[in-house]
Amino acid sequence: MTAKHDIAPPGAPPGAPPGAPAGPSTGRPSRRSRGLGTAAARLAFLGPGLGYLIVLLLVPLALVLSYTVFRRGRFGGVVYEWTLENFTRLFDPLYFDVVLSSVKTATLTTLAALLIGYPTAYVIAGLPRKWKTIALIAVVMPFWTNFLIRVYAWIILLSGPGLVNEALTGIGLIDKPLQLLYNQGTIVTGLLYSYLPLMILPLYAAIERLDPQLREASANLGARPARTFWSVTFPLTVPGVLTGCVFVFVPCLGNFVIPEILGGGRSIMVGNLIRDQFLKARDWPFGSTLALAVIAVLVVLLFLQAWASRVYGGTEGRRA
Amino acid sequence: MPRRRLIYVPFWATYVFLYTPIIVLVVMSFNAGKSPYVFEGLSLKWYGELAGNDTIRQGLVNTLIVAVGTTVLSTVLGTLLAVGMARHTRSRLLDALGLLPAVLPDLVLAIGLLVFYATIKMTLGLHSVILAHTVFGMAFVAAVVRTRLTHADTSLEEASRDLGASPLATFTRITLPTLAPGIAAGALLAFTLSIDEFVIAFFTAAPTEPTLPIVIYSMVRFGVTPEINALATILLAVSFTVIIVAQRMTRLTESLS
Amino acid sequence: MSRIRYTRHLPAATVAAGLVLALAACGGSSSTSADGAAPSAAAEQLNPNADLSKQSLTITIWDGYSPKDLADQVKKKLGFELKTAIHDTNETAMAKLTANADSGIDVAFVSGQYAQALNEQGLLEPLHSELIPNLANLYPEAAQLSFDKGNKFSVPYTWGTTGICYRTDLVKTPPTSWNDLLNPSADLKGKVTMMTTERWLALPALKQLGLSINTTDDKQLAQAKDLLLKAKQGGMLYDDTTFGAKLEKGEAALVEAWDGWCPTTNPKIKFVVPKEGSDLWSDTMVIMKTSKNKEAAHAFINYILDPAVHSWVGENILYKVPNKAAMDLLIKNNQDLLAKNTPLQMTPAELLKGESIVDLGEASTKYTRLATEISANQ
């Protein structure tokens, strides 16, 4: 779904995953001794892009923000009467629990992605150059076919007569097809499937940058491989881990398609609530308030990320 | 050493996980029968059906128009922005603004634009999707180009300026050619992001002009015919070709520069 | 373009009409008159002899709900271009029709209560019945639908009811009551589905309790909620669009379904209206006020009501049409189909026993909340 998070720049060199500059690992250009140019040049370069972002990004976000304190119009839109009702409603257990459980689902997916993504990235980073490229492209490849079609494929795989049940019955693990579709696990599977590469790419970038001599030094000093990993390798890759976690967590939290297609209407996430406020209930102010809650969660997350990368930052092995 | 091999388990699991659904899709697109579960023999009939499906064709045309429009707009604005941010300002705030579209959940951007278009009473159409896609397209182009700028050697630009060239001349003669591979990569990125983008298009497209992902979404909701599998297979094949070509091109441009 | 922006350039009378309209739109809760007559003050003068070939028409409709070659037919018979947009649910259509000043849609196909809501918002053009002579083909009952008595702003395209659709080979005792859906026998677990569209989600529970499907009473809705939550805990699945296909594949055994979506041409599948009663729904055609092709829009609706055209619906998608001439034609030409398809045999009198779903104004948020409570429950 979040196509914009989906794909690595095809021409970008390995080590520069999509949006990598968003991560903590890319600092400001270090060598910058020249002046900043004339005011006219500054305006010519920065003006169009910033103007565009102000009109089509900041103004819309400000509108959403301002809607949170108004009443809904009966048929969508907004009535300009002040109210704090939307915020009271946000803390209504009905909606707040959905927000909480969405955070839980997104966290679960992120952890699963980290667990499977870290070793994968680790192996890829150690491959010979040619295989490295192939392995990386293979991680990105699935993104090149439509997101919705890929999600749909999971219905075929997991349904009663589907491949997974066939396989499980075939090897004798079960004797009767399991109900694999339409539950929380299915949603996590779908989310994991959709965003796993967003975890692998920044992890790969972080691991690849490590100086192998560090590990050798640690081993030479008598550390066991496990100890080397936990006390040397892992801390150095924490910034990459954090970037990957943000990349996975963010699109998971706002998702509404996967719960809808793979959840069988039995569970919803905050994305569904927001979508429904705009497209079904036509309650734009409350939809905006829910969106604000999502933004709030993300701001907390980004602060955590900044804090953690500062704690682990400053160590060698990262590009300054 | 067993410990060493253990790490290969998640590695291979990742690829099995990523590719099983895709293999199923591709195989089933050649299925003679209608059932998504039982393979009843080889046939190209779903590709034929697909070719005759006007809704999908129209969606594809709309998607291509949007993607091309987005690419052009994003590339121009994104490149200028990247150069501007790297060479003409040191504002951290601007940095953050430039990256905001990349970290903002697409749903939030989508409803923001929906509200905005409704407020200014803009009639929706392909143009409204292009404007929306450019918001994130530009951010990604800027990000890719900046990566290149940061690594680029600035001495040529400085020399050009010291020799009295105008900022414009410096930009067109020196900066742009240096950045060309980055710009090309950014453009390709904007194009592919736009082609597969669903959520923002879903909120900002006119009902009369759905893009391909919107068409697919409504088809999936009504239960899928193997036509969808055929479509997926074709998209996959096209993407594969594009990747190969892109790889070749970057290698070519890199060896030239 | 917004009607209100127009008014600057129009004579005083129209300005006044426009103001009434604007007030009606902004007033919100102030009035929800049942006959919906208020906004029709702003009726426009239409030219019955307009050159249709200079117009073009955009409609929005459910996928597969009209003949594939409809555009060609219209071009040939009426002389203008027809463009078709697809919506998957009423809500999607409503979102598009209400979000912006001009959606680009001339004629929309939406269910009755949604037509009513659009009209209350002042978004619909009152029908000029003199431009739709084929209205005479409709059953007299078709003008009695409570969301729009007298067809002032909507023309029913199809009508029917909601019931239980089931596989005779997978369900041991044929269902007769909504309780058989809400509380199915243990062997059907994971094979029963309900619809999630708010009003149809509440319908089985409300009818089971002997209540009105238009109730706004909090206590009654709370009772319905309990029943629906129990059903969910019993393993209920939710499906608005693919339940027919699931029944045919055997992935589902018993589902809540609109009559026309129950694939009764399959000998193993049957449709029943539970004994507690059900609804009378109608999908209607409405003309948007923003349309710049209103003559073409009327001509289009008139064309649809032609018996030969309208009977396509019954023949191909097995929905009943409220068009007597078309149904007579259908019955004459399709004896086999009719014999196999019990829902198609229902008469207007039988249909009118069902309760019409009407728009509930502000109170409709109660149903939205109910639906959220059901889907958010784990």
Feature map (PLM): residue ranges:
Chain C
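A ligand-binding cleft/hinge motif common to bilobed small-molecule-binding domains
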Residues: Q113-A117, E248-K249, L254-I269
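Mature extracytoplasmic/periplasmic domains
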Residues: M288-L351
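Periplasmic-binding protein-like
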Residues: G160, L221-K230, P267-S291, N333-D336
